[in-house]
Amino acid sequence: MSDTLLNPYFGEFGGMYVPEILVPVLKQLEETFVAAQNDPLFQAEFTDLLKNYAGRPTALTLCRNLTKGSKTKLYLKREDLLHGGAHKTNQVLGQALLAKRMGKTRIIAETGAGQHGVATALACAMLDLPCVIYMGAKDVERQSPNVFRMRLMGAEVIPVQKGSCSLKDACCEAMRDWAANYETTHYLIGTAAGPHPFPTMVREFQKMIGEETKRQILEKENRLPDAVIAAVGGGSNAIGMFAGFIEEKSVQLIGVEPAGKGIETGEHGAPLKHGTTGIYFGMKSPIMQTKDGQIEESYSISAGLDFPSVGPQHAYLNASGRADYVSITDKEALDAFQALAQHEGIIPALESSHALAYALKLIAQNPDKEQLLVVNLSGRGDKDIFTVDKILNGGN
């Protein structure tokens, strides 16, 4: 793979492990991406859409009540305020513009929580591109508001009945579709994972999260935060936040994986800390797999974190020690979900609630420590209210 324009690896992780038929397609995508990055007209169109369609920059909000009794200042980067309800819209607009530039006439995508599906559907509606979304049947059931939104915007939503009927199965079906229809179709991957150039491309189309946060925190506090905290499934919201701070060695980068029902139960989605390196979804990265290499089922209350692998740059940041990765259980995430709603009037996505829960844990452990924390509130929780209601009122 020495003939790629960009390095396809992050340390030992990443690469382009795809059927031979897709290699030229990925190379075309990489060439188009590199050209677009250097094209002021492309950048101007992307920036204009982010500002006037998606609503950037998003706010950096100080929590006024959650930190009472402590010396911590906690800020939330409000990606929940972005059009579409989550950070997903950022990079979807970038990839959709690339697809048009390549002359593709059809977009496919996978989605777990439905947020990436919604973002893809809205971008395709606005740019007049047909759109097919693959979604695990289990997720179709638990994310019905987002399924309706996608269909309302003209997307075809295909429930995937195979395997565990979750995000990993939706990814496999989308990859199959792409291999069969690559000449006309762009596969708009929803996270910073998959074969090269997707992890690099998605990071570049999400990095404004960290860049804005850095500018905003310096403006408000006149210093950098002690830590930035983000939930990690595939890893796009976290890499978008981390990208602004990787070079700032004084800032701790904390990624939060889902511990589900508890790491010891095996029902979790924490491959970075509890998986082994393997090949999956076109990349080399940590995976939840059995000793004979079968992909294990991941689990999280949050559909968007229910993924058995993780983006290769996170694997590298973990291996190199630059970022720290921790895990939060369903229960801790639910408690944080309720706490933010009750004390700040903000309903976070269950994905983002994992990051918030870890911040609250840090505050509780060190109430007398003066610390400045930023949580990436990657999405809003409207999509999760039925799931949470069911659990709190005696459901699962």
Swiss-Prot record:
PROSITE patterns: TRP_SYNTHASE_BETA. This is Tryptophan synthase beta chain. It comes from Actinobacillus pleuropneumoniae serotype 7 (strain AP76). The beta subunit is responsible for the synthesis of L-tryptophan from indole and L-serine. It comes from the Bacteria. The modification N6-(pyridoxal phosphate)lysine is found at K88. Tetramer of two alpha and two beta chains. Pathway: Amino-acid biosynthesis; L-tryptophan biosynthesis; L-tryptophan from chorismate: step 5/5. Its cofactor is pyridoxal 5'-phosphate. GO terms for cellular component: cytoplasm.
